[in-house]
């Protein structure tokens, strides 16, 4: 069951990579709401040759990485200190989007997709 939950949350990572690939126009916003899984499936299903797509510029992706690193840090600090997670953040969405950006930009510790971004963030 835990593996199924983890798989389901990976759609947030997929949404982030869809953003990197410029398959959506809207910005990658504050991680407070979950993505639309049906939309992700439709986008991937209806896009020919994903490997040929041009990604967003490095500076845009690195700017998002830094922003999501800060969101992730805020969530982890709140949990470690027994405080409430900031109300504008969802811990799981934050974790998965940070994971995807870290993996895509080849950050140390994120060399493999299946690596874990667990730093005190709840998995359920």
Language-model regions, residue ranges each:
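Extended, charge-rich alpha-helical interface modules
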Residues: 1-124
């Amino acid at each position: 069951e835990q593996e199924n939950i983890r798989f389901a949350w990976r759609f947030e990572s997929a949404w982030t990579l869809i953003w990197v690939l410029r398959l959506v126009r809207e910005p990658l916003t504050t991680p407070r709401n979950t993505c639309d899984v049906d939309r992700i499936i439709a986008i991937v299903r209806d896009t020919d040759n994903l490997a040929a797509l041009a990604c967003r510029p490095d500076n845009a992706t690195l700017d998002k990485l830094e922003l999501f690193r800060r969101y992730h840090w805020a969530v982890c600090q709140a949990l470690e200190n027994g405080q409430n997670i900031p109300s504008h953040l969802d811990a799981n969405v934050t974790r998965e989007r940070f994971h995807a950006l870290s993996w895509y930009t080849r950050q140390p510790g994120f060399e493999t997709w299946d690596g874990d971004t667990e730093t005190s963030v709840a998995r359920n």
